[in-house]
Amino acid sequence: AREDALAVLWETSRIRLEREILPEELDLTPMSVTRDPELEETQAAALLGELTASPPEALRYVGAKGAAQFYVDGEFSAEFRTGAYPLAGAEPEEFAVDLLATIGFEAQVMSTEESGGETVVTLRQCWEGTPVFDRTAVLVFRDEELKSIQRNVSYRLTGIPKQEGMEQPMNLVTLLMRFVDYVNRNSRVCNEITGFTAGYLLDSNAQSDPALLIPAWYVTTDQGSYFWNAITGEITPEG
């Protein structure tokens, strides 16, 4: 069936997909994440040192090294005092990965940009080695030290994921046919699929608690990238 899918992909839509790029089926099931205020406070203390202020509903924490904000939907940010986090010869990427590990954020470096004396490192959160596509942290370095975790673009898992039922992901053949239909219906241009990355997406209602982690594919093409929800079959262009 997988071989047939490659032929159908080409015959119906003229989209190329090399056989060696086609991955194994997804071995992931949906997970739920419930906000854990105690974990949040522990993470704030790991970032800020001894906490001097932590309101009952959390949100804003103040400590020896600066201040941080944590939101119900997973957004977080921090501003650090001068001298709190000197690089001390470390590379910004390595420093960022190690720092985020202290708050249980298993990080994968996505990009590094330098502009106007600042180095900006963007990292993606993983859970047990699997990327969570819409959980990223953006760390800003200046003058050889960490200055901030950027607001509005930094999101984390708010608790420890737990398995949620046994619903199995759609197989790749089904998803490929969904993609063909999506491309045709939306008059998208796509000549070739160039890569697949397995991971999770958070359900669109990020304010819900618990939130759901949905098995998904991140699919690159010659004309942009897409997220394929492997439970519902929904196709969403990146960005």
Q: What name fits each language-model region?
A:
Residues A58-T82, T122-I160, T220-I235:
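Amphipathic N-proximal alpha-helical interface segments
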Residues D98-E106, V138-R142, Y182, N186:
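Structured segments of extracytoplasmic/periplasmic soluble domains
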Residues L146-G239:
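Extracytoplasmic/luminal low-complexity segments enriched in Pro/Gly and acidic/polar residues
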Residues E113-E118:
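Extended, Lys/Arg-enriched charged tracts that mediate electrostatic binding to polyanionic substrates
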Residues A1-S111, T122-G129:
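Preferential activation on post-signal-peptide N-terminal prodomains/segments
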